[in-house]
């Protein structure tokens, strides 16, 4: 299966960005709650 670099980077960003966003949101709520 041939995957071009742009598609590979786009896939990584598509997964990574929401994960980091949720992680920051989770940490912020934990700091506020405690």
From Swiss-Prot:
How is this protein situated with respect to the membrane? Single-pass membrane protein
Please list every transmembrane segment annotated in the UniProt record, as residue ranges. 7-27
Q: Which UniProt keywords apply?
A: Membrane, Photosynthesis, Photosystem II, Reaction center, Thylakoid, Transmembrane, Transmembrane helix
Subcellular localization is given as: Cellular thylakoid membrane
Fetch the InterPro entries from UniProt. PSII_PsbM, PSII_PsbM_sf
Q: GO annotations under biological process? A: photosynthesis, light reaction
Q: Name one GO cellular component term.
A: photosystem II
Spell out the Pfam families in the cross-references. Answer: PsbM
The subunit structure is: PSII is composed of 1 copy each of membrane proteins PsbA, PsbB, PsbC, PsbD, PsbE, PsbF, PsbH, PsbI, PsbJ, PsbK, PsbL, PsbM, PsbT, PsbX, PsbY, PsbZ, Psb30/Ycf12, peripheral proteins PsbO, CyanoQ (PsbQ), PsbU, PsbV and a large number of cofactors. It forms dimeric complexes.
PANTHER family for the chain = PHOTOSYSTEM II REACTION CENTER PROTEIN M
Outline what the protein does: One of the components of the core complex of photosystem II (PSII). PSII is a light-driven water:plastoquinone oxidoreductase that uses light energy to abstract electrons from H(2)O, generating O(2) and a proton gradient subsequently used for ATP formation. It consists of a core antenna complex that captures photons, and an electron transfer chain that converts photonic excitation into a charge separation. This subunit is found at the monomer-monomer interface.
Q: Tell me its family.
A: Belongs to the PsbM family.
> Can you name this protein?
Photosystem II reaction center protein M
Q: Which gene encodes it?
A: psbM
């Amino acid at each position: 299966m041939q995957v071009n670099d742009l598609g590979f980077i786009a896939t990584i960003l598509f997964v990574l960005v929401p994960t980091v966003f949720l992680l920051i949101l989770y940490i912020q709520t934990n700091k506020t709650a405690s």
